[in-house]
């Protein structure tokens, strides 16, 4: 089977807590004792130095060294030598463009899918782990050469998923309506709406919903379904043609 190991987190910060505070135990369990250093990809934010400082402080507090890819003179070589990869949140379009600009799409895919290097993403970093960034919440502030992403899983994710607020007077589309519009297009893959506080752990061909909140699954042509932490989503990994059912 596929050696991939992924921890796809909806959000970096949960209300009332610090950076990655809500998932730090999951991070330690995921990386374990074999990983000594993590390669951080700060491309989703403009101030990469400040972003790297924040991430380094957190990971060092968990017992891991952190190298930021933007400090490397050869980003491709940094990926090839990495023990684990963490792509942080920010603007998904800016992030994906930088991954293409630095020729990292295929390199990261190979390291994760063939070499089994652990991959962690939060928010935008979770978006780019999927088929495409079509279901991001972000504004297209820059123009990547493609919306196709890393494809580490054969479906899409909507991080920071928000349920409709019955008391709101806002007349714009809800998140659910926007995802339904996406699924009006042919051959669009499943979309997993990850609420803040939720994350998906993928180990080989097994995927499990973790965290403190649930998720909402959208399949093309089907009514969305509600899922609690602990749900086995392995079927999403096995069958990428669920939208045709």
List PLM regions with ranges.
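C-terminal and late-domain segments of enzyme folds
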Residues: 1-33, 46-53, 57, 134-135, ...
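Glycine/threonine-rich flexible loop motifs
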Residues: 92-102, 168
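Catalytic nucleophile loop
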Residues: 86-89, 112-132
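A short, aliphatic-rich alpha-helical micro-motif
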Residues: 79-80
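Short hydrophobic beta-strand segments
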Residues: 37-45
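Conserved acidic residues
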Residues: 36, 83
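An anion-binding catalytic pocket shared by soluble metabolic enzymes
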Residues: 8, 66-73, 91
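Catalytic-core regions built around general acid/base machinery
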Residues: 101-116
């Amino acid at each position: 089977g596929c050696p991939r190991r992924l921890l796809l987190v909806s959000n970096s910060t949960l209300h009332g807590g610090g950076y990655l505070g809500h998932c730090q135990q999951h991070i330690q369990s995921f990386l374990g004792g074999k990983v000594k250093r993590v390669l951080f990809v700060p491309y989703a934010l403009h101030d990469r130095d400040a972003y790297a400082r924040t991430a380094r402080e957190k990971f060092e507090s968990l017992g891991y060294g952190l190298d930021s890819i933007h400090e490397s003179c050869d980003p491709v070589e940094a990926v090839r030598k990495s023990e684990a990869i963490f792509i942080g949140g920010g603007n998904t379009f800016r992030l994906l463009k930088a991954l293409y600009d630095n020729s990292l799409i295929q390199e990261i895919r190979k390291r994760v899918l063939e070499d089994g290097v652990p991959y962690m993403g939060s928010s935008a970093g979770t978006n780019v782990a999927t088929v495409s960034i079509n279901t991001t919440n972000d504004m297209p502030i820059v123009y990547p050469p493609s919306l196709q992403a890393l494809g580490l899983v054969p479906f899409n994710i909507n991080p920071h998923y928000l349920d409709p607020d019955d008391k709101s007077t806002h007349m714009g589309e809800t998140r659910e309506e926007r995802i339904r519009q996406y699924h009006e297009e042919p051959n669009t893959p499943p979309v997993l709406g990850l609420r803040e506080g939720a994350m998906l752990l993928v180990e080989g061909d097994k995927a499990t919903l973790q965290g403190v909140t649930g998720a909402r699954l959208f399949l093309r042509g089907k009514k969305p379904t509600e899922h609690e932490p602990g749900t086995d989503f392995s079927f999403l990994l096995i069958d990428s043609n669920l939208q045709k059912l």
